[in-house]
Amino acid sequence: GIDIAPRVLRQLFFLAYDRRNIAPILADCAHPEEYDYRICMCDFLIQDIAQKGQLEIFLKNLKFLKPGGTGFLAIKARSIDVTKPPYKIFEQVKKQLEENKIKIIDYKTLDPFEKDHCVFVIQK
């Protein structure tokens, strides 16, 4: 698990103690070149961040996902562009995933639980 916040990483450390398949890494997920030497290929990749380049960051980190592996991408539309309707952003993300030859297994908006959020489940 990668996080840039030391407090969050401390919590992740305790979780990783019980779950041996998680390794806590203090880093910025937008720069995988800074931590790629510490990561092996994974079966499952989860990204849940609130940054403008959410999709681009996910695509950069997909190199760590094994062929046939599953990815989970949470998109926060308002973090990408507050001026566009969320459904347009979700359509744009879907199109870009398809253009990158990413197989979309499912995607759902999270309304009414989380406003302006959508999740994509993909397979590499």
PLM ranges: what are they?
Residues 8-14, 18, 59-123:
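C-terminal substrate-binding/active-site "lid" region of AdoMet-derived donor-dependent transferases
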Residues 2-54:
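S-adenosyl-L-methionine
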